[in-house]
Amino acid sequence: RLMIRNFFIAICSIIFCPYNLQGQNGVSLETKLVHKLTLVADSLTKHLKPWIVPVSIFDVRKYGAIGDGSTLNTTAIQKAIDACFVAGGGTVRIAGGEYVTGTIELKSGVMLEVAKGARLLGSTNLKDYPDKVERFQSVMNVIHKYRISLIYAERAERVGICGEGEIYFRGEAKNFPGPETIGALEGRPFGIRMIECNNVVLKGITLRNSAAW
C-alpha cells in the first residue's frame, strides 16, 4: 500500500509538475500540488485492502493432472480450481512437470501458482478453447470474435497468478496454421483474459508466446 501511494504521488508529480512554478507566499505551486496529491493518495490507500491468500493448497495432481507434456489436463486443473473456490479460496498449485491444458476459468479467491521448474502449456488444438461470451461485449468480441483464451476470469474478486514457473502459451504460427487463424482473428486465443475482476495479482510468473495480445 505504501509503494502504491508513493508511486501515485511520483507519477502525478511528473505529469503535473514539470516546472518549479512559484506561487504566493514563497510556496511553489509544485509544493502545493504535491501536498494535495499526498492527501488524495492517503485517502485512496485507506480503501485498499491487500489480498491475503488462504493457506489451503490444492495440488492439481491430486485431481488427476499428469505433467508429462502431452496429456490434456483441462478437466483436472479446473476441478482443482472449483474445489479451491468452494473451500473459500487458496492456492491451486501446478508443480513437478509440464501440464498441457485448454481454457481454464479462475474464480474468486483462487491463486494459480506455477511452481519453480514447472510449466503450464497451452493446447495447440483450437477445440480446447471454447468461446467465453462475456456479459458486456466489446467491438473486438462482436466483430472479430475474440472470445477464446487459455486463462479466463469474469467478475472474480481476489484472483491471481504467481510462481517461479512458466506459462508457455505456444502461440507460434506453426501451432495455429489453419485458415481460421489467418489475419489473427478468431483462431488465435488470448493468453490471459480477465473481465471486470477486482484485486488481481500477477506476481513472479514468466509468460511466453501468447497467440494473441
Q: Where do the PLM segments sit?
A:
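Extracellular/periplasmic carbohydrate-active domains that bind, remodel
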Residues: 22-213
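Bacterial Sec-dependent N-terminal signal peptides
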Residues: 1-27
